[in-house]
Swiss-Prot record:
Coiled-coil boundaries: 173-423, 641-697, 784-807, 882-905
Record region (Disordered): 151-170, 586-614, 714-740
Annotated gene: KIP1
Entry's localization field: Cytoplasm
The protein's assembly and partners: Homodimer or homooligomer. Interacts with PRK1.
Gene source species: Petunia integrifolia (Violet-flowered petunia)
Name of the molecule in the record: Kinase-interacting protein 1
Length: 974
């Protein structure tokens, strides 16, 4: 709910603009109709001077006029059919919008007559004798109040009872049974009609309240916009503050709704007590009457008395325990997401309470009707003095009244049970509202708090509270003594069973603990739900549980979860198809008792439920069999529980999916950061390597120059004093091999020096290669268009030949052929223009190929010139490098030649295609005169413009020309 409110928080204005554009079909139809009208007018304008010419006009041109009328009728019919189709689609769209967004549609909820649709007048289907054939709108069904509805229902009941049913054997019932069944169904219908009226009134009031709130929101938003426009400043509410405000509003609304529901429930309880007093009075009268006239022949009738005081005391104790347990289970702070989930659960619970309170109205109305009928029967029995003499008939009537009294007692039990359930849910809702209101001030963001583990004591306490709720509901059934014994047994054995579940194995405990806080928080969140019965399902599900408790009190309805052991020690909790299952607590085996102490000290609980697919299918079959045997009410409850469980599973899967997507986004972001860091580190390392290589090259050059100077100085023959006392062995031994090895060891990874000519050639070749991508893209797109042009022209020529064949065979007149040829002619002209543009574009490709060829030739000349000349630098341009460059250039020239050949072939094909298109266009123009019509239309458009002279100086009045229609009928005066 909070997410919907947040998503709609800023969507105050909604503007939808429906722009219509003219359909090509409509435009073509209008154009064709205009041409046909012009041709028919020309045909009509012709005058017949002689009898022969008039006869020719009659016999020759009359079929053309008839054909024109038929074609006009067909065109109008097609237009009407399209309009009808669009009207149906629009009606369907309106119904769909009204179904999906009922709050946007003004609903006129007219009351229905009796139990079905409103009655139509007798003359509704009769067509009027004259005038339009449109039927009149039927009058609105008469609106009746609740009393009138009840009176008509009772009258109909009496009328149907008085009628004779001849075919009673078809239903398999006797006459008396059929009358009883009709009576029961009539009462059910009356109760449902009452419920419908109540829901309708509540819906209308809720709808008015909704619209009022929407108007207030719009007014406040408009005021905000005005203030922002006036002062030029705005304020944005922070996310935390907005969430807090929405949570406070939701809690306040829930609290007000619960208060109103409690007041209604108290009033209903008071009414039920008054009706119960009436039943007690009737029972006392019946007992006194029986003692007076029948003696001790029949046992006294006993009235079921509801233990209201005991229920009140137990509800007070339950309220205190619920508050203590809620405080114990949530000692830490709540995150914003946890708070939103809890508020959503609370809102769903309040909505279910509203439905339960409204259903209590139906039950109370039925209880009141039964009590009134019982009083009437007792009073009739007392007033009928003639029947007092006949003891046999008197016994029969008293027995019938006692059976009626027994039914009323059962109905009273249902009222008391529903009352206790509602009070229990009210207590729980109040406690949750108070708890969330207290936690609202200490809400933290989602990242600042982790889920904590739930202790076994808390789980046991939750189970005890729920078992007390079951006992509270079962105490209202005095006939279920055996069920209460089983309930007390389960209540006493509850902690033992929980400890048994807790001792299912330390391996699964350690494994689930190793899975991380996510699995633990999931188990913590789902644990109380599984241990407690479904409290949020509403009174219907609670009443279903009440009927099932005496049969199987040791079973608990939970979601289907499996714990499978993988690799000896790992357990995986997997959600499967959510079904209604009965899971019994396992008893500890002797082998497991040794591990009980270890698992008790761990402080965590492990959910261990193993169900195979076969057992799931059996449980499903049992549920459906139970649903069919239990009747309509239990079937609805079971279906409601099934739907709620599926919806809960869907929410969990959606939450897990969002968590996985969030993890994927985080992982992708981390990988992006790591990639950036690696790129920066690699760039720094490359820069350092480059600097070190430069330093090494400088050091090598310096050492070589020093060694050379030292040799020259020592071996200089012009200085005799320097070589006087020196011997050859005293000179430093400098070996070329050692120097080469030193250079190789130092410059292992150093790149070879590049000559200027080699660098220049490499730059030229790289420039040509860089242009290859753009060139190939343009060439491929141009080459691809050739096949497209060829296919289009071929299709158009086929269509033109088909139209000509129709004209030759005489199947269609020339006007229709001309209307079919016109769009083909336009398309052919467009293709002709596109072919011209394509040829112009290919000229640039040819120029670029020539430029690339000349560039490659110049590179070849530079390579040959570099081999002949000697380079003055230390490094020379070797023949190996020249051969390498020469091979690259030759490959590029070969590719260039192939591309030029393909381009020339494509140009020749397009040129032939262009000639064919021009020839076809010329033939169409000569045959049908399509260019002339376009020039006439252009002239008519130009004539309709106002000249500048007339616009400035005005126009002189001219003589009126005779219109086209006056020429058609010259004798008629306008």
């Amino acid at each position: 709910m909070l997410q919907r409110a947040a998503s709609n928080a800023y969507s105050w204005w909604a503007a939808s603009h429906i722009r219509t554009k003219q359909s090509k079909w409509l435009e073509q139809s209008l154009h064709d109709m205009q041409g046909r009208v012009e041709s028919v007018i020309k045909l009509i304008e012709e005058d017949g001077d002689s009898f022969a010419k008039r006869a020719e006009m009659y016999y020759k041109k009359r079929p053309e006029l008839i054909n024109f009328v038929e074609e006009s009728y067909r065109a109008y019919r097609a237009l009407a059919e399209r309009y009808d189709h669009l009207s149906k689609e629009l009606q369907t769209a309106n119904n769909t919008i009204a179904t999906i967004f009922p709050e946007q549609i003004q609903l006129a909820m007219d009351e229905e007559d009796e139990y079905g649709a409103p009655k139509m007048p007798k003359d509704f289907l009769q067509m009027p004798a004259s005038g339009s054939n449109i039927p009149k709108v039927p009058p609105k069904a008469p609106i009746k109040d609740l009393k009138g509805l009840m009176s008509t229902a009772s009258k109909q009941k009496q009328g149907k009872q008085s009628s004779k049913i001849e075919d009673a054997a078809k239903s398999g019932l006797s006459k008396n049974e059929a009358i009883e069944e009709i009576d029961k169904l009539q009462k059910d219908i009356l109760a449902l009609q009452t419920m419908k009226e109540f829901i309708r009134s509540s819906y209308q009031s809720s709808l008015e309240k909704f619209r009022g709130l929407e108007n207030q929101i719009m007014e406040k938003q408009q005021k905000i916009c005005e203030l922002e426009d006036e002062f030029g400043e705005g304020r944005v509410i922070e996310d935390a503050e907005a969430c807090t405000l929405m949570a406070e509003a939701a809690l306040q609304s829930c609290q007000e709704t619960v208060t109103q529901l409690q007041e209604k429930q108290e009033s209903y309880t008071q009414e039920a007590r008054e009706e119960f007093k009436k039943i007690e009075d009737a029972c006392n009268k019946l007992n006194s009457f029986r003692h007076k006239y029948l003696g001790d022949q029949i046992d006294e009738a006993k009235v079921y008395i509801s233990p209201i005081q005991e229920v009140d005391k137990e509800i007070e104790s339950l309220q205190e325990k619920i508050k203590d347990q809620i405080d114990a289970t949530s000692k830490g702070s709540l995150t914003m997401s946890q708070l939103a989930e809890k508020i959503d659960e609370l809102v769903n619970k309040v909505v279910s309470l509203e439905t339960a309170v409204s259903s209590q109205t139906l039950l109370l109305e039925r209880f009141r009707a039964e009590a009134d009928e019982l009083q009437a029967q007792v009073q009739t029995l007392e007033d009928d003095k003639a029947a007092l003499t006949d003891t046999h008939n008197l016994n029969i009537r008293v027995t019938a009244i006692e059976a009626k009294l027994q039914n009323i007692e059962n109905l009273n039990k249902d009222v008391v049970n529903q009352n206790s359930c509602l009070r229990t849910h009210f207590v729980e809702a109040r406690a949750n509202i108070d708890h969330l209101s207290d936690k609202l001030s200490s809400v933290q963001p989602d990242e600042e708090i982790d889920g904590t583990d739930s202790s076994p004591d808390q789980v046991i306490a939750l189970a005890e509270i729920k078992l007390e709720e079951e006992s509270l509901k079962q105490k209202d059934h005095p006939s279920s003594a055996e069920g209460l014994k089983n309930l007390s047994t389960i209540k006493a054995e509850g902690p033992k069973n929980l400890s048994t579940i807790k001792t299912e194995g330390p391996k699964s405990l350690s494994t689930i603990k190793a899975e991380g806080p996510k699995n633990l928080s999931t188990i913590k969140a789902e644990g109380p739900k599984n241990l407690s019965t479904i409290k949020t399902e509403g009174p219907k599900s609670l009443s279903t549980i009440e009927t099932e408790v005496p049969k199987n009190l040791s079973t608990i309805k939970t979601e289907d979860k499996e714990v499978r052991k993988q690799q000896g020690s790992s357990t995986v909790v997997s959600d499967k198809k959510t079904t209604m299952k009965h899971v019994t607590f396992a008893q500890p085996t002797p082998a497991e008792k040794g591990d009980e102490k270890v698992s008790a000290q761990s402080g965590n609980t492990s959910v261990y439920e193993t169900h195979t697919q076969k057992s799931a299918e059996k449980d499903d079959e049992l549920n459906w069999q139970q649903m069919l045997l239990s009747g309509l009410d239990d079937k609805e409850n079971i279906l409601l529980n099934e739907y709620t469980a599926i919806l809960k599973n869907y929410k969990e899967v959606t939450k897990k999916l969002s968590d996985i997507e969030k993890k994927d986004r985080d992982t992708e972001f981390e990988l992006t950061l790591q990639t950036r860091e690696l790129k920066s580190a690699i760039a720094k390392r490359d820069e350092e390597i480059h600097n070190l290589r430069q330093k090494l090259s400088l050091m090598q050059q310096g050492n070589a120059s020093e060694n050379k100077a030292l040799k020259e100085e020592l071996l200089d023959p012009s200085d005799p004093s320097s070589a006087r006392g020196l011997k050859p062995e005293d000179l430093p031994q400098i070996k070329d091999g050692d120097d080469e090895e030193d250079v190789k060891t130092i410059l292992v990874d150093q790149r070879a020096t590049v000559s200027p000519l080699e660098g220049k050639l490499r730059m030229s070749i790289d420039a040509i290669l860089d242009e290859n991508l753009d060139f190939w893209l343009r060439f491929s797109s141009a080459f691809h268009q050739i096949q497209k042009f060829k296919t289009t022209v071929h299709d158009l020529q086929n269509e033109i030949s088909k139209a000509r064949d129709k004209e030759m065979q005489g199947n269609s007149p020339r006007v229709d052929v001309k209307s079919e040829i016109r769009p083909l002619y336009k398309h052919m002209k467009e293709i002709q223009n596109e072919l011209t543009v394509w040829l112009e574009q290919t000229l640039s490709l040819k120029d670029e190929l020539e430029r690339r060829f000349s560039a490659l030739c110049s590179i070849q000349e530079e390579i040959s010139k570099g081999l002949k000349e000697e380079v003055e630098d230390e490094t020379t341009f070797s023949s190996h490098q020249a051969a390498k460059f020469q091979g690259e250039v030759l490959n590029m020239k070969h590719e260039n030649k192939k591309v030029r050949e393909e381009l020339e072939a494509g140009i020749s094909r397009v040129t032939i295609l262009q000639e064919d298109v021009e020839k076809t266009v010329t033939q169409l123009d000569q045959e049908f005169g399509l260019t002339g019509n376009q020039s006439q239309l252009m002239q008519s458009v130009s004539k309709s413009r106002i000249p500048l002279q007339s616009f400035i100086f005005g126009t002189k009045p001219k003589k009126e020309k005779r219109s086209l229609f006056s020429r058609m009928n010259p004798n008629r005066k306008f």
